[in-house]
């Protein structure tokens, strides 16, 4: 009986998070876009089924530009997983400089990512986001970039604070 009680107490204090789940390569149908925007940078969805014109994306949305090979990008994934778990703001990833699309898919599955990912096949996003990663942009409902985070987002608290401040989304 004593063991059961101790085990129950122990299990109560173990944090259960989505970080251990398997990711899913999802389609881009959930990305809010202004369909009247017909010109701009067209990026394929990592699932290979659709393309999205970057300039047509509308928010509130957090755009995270990353590469699976990038150590700081890997460090910030848990913070995006925490944000996604709140279901309050959209996240869209842009995978850059991968050897191929399958490498990006493998990364998504391994890291537990479940938000739409666009795939930059030829470094076309460098002209928009710059050459380094990670880069995170916060885009409002009108499609305006209201904040740019260059470099790693170091904590979930910082990410949530930026969403609150720049996208006016209460978390």
What are these regions (language model features)?
Residues 59-61, 66-69, 132:
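Short pre-active-site segment immediately N-terminal to redox-active cysteine/selenocysteine motifs
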Residues 40-61:
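A short beta-strand-turn-helix
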Residues 65-82:
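Conserved redox-active cysteine motifs that mediate thiol-disulfide chemistry
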Residues 109-113, 120-167:
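Thiol/disulfide oxidoreductase modules built on the thioredoxin-like
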Residues 67-72, 97-101, 123-124, 152-153:
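Solvent-exposed loop/turn segments at secondary-structure junctions
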Residues 85, 90-121:
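Conserved segment of the thioredoxin-like fold in thiol-based oxidoreductases
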């Amino acid at each position: 009986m004593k063991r059961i009680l101790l085990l129950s107490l122990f299990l109560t204090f173990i944090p259960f998070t989505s970080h251990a789940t398997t990711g899913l390569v999802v389609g881009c149908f959930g990305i809010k876009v202004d369909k009247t925007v017909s010109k701009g940078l067209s990026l394929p969805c990592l699932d290979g089924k659709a393309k999205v014109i970057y300039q047509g994306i509308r928010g509130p949305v957090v755009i995270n530009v990353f590469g699976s090979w990038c150590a700081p990008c890997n460090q910030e994934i848990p913070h995006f997983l925490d944000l996604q778990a709140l279901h309050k703001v959209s996240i869209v990833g842009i995978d850059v400089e991968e050897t191929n699309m399958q490498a990006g898919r493998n990364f998504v599955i391994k890291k537990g990512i479940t938000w739409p990912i666009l795939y930059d096949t030829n470094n076309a996003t460098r002209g928009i986001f710059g050459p380094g990663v990670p880069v995170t942009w916060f885009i409002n409902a009108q499609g305006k970039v209201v904040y740019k985070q260059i470099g790693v987002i170091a904590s979930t608290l910082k990410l949530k604070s930026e969403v609150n401040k720049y996208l006016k989304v209460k978390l």
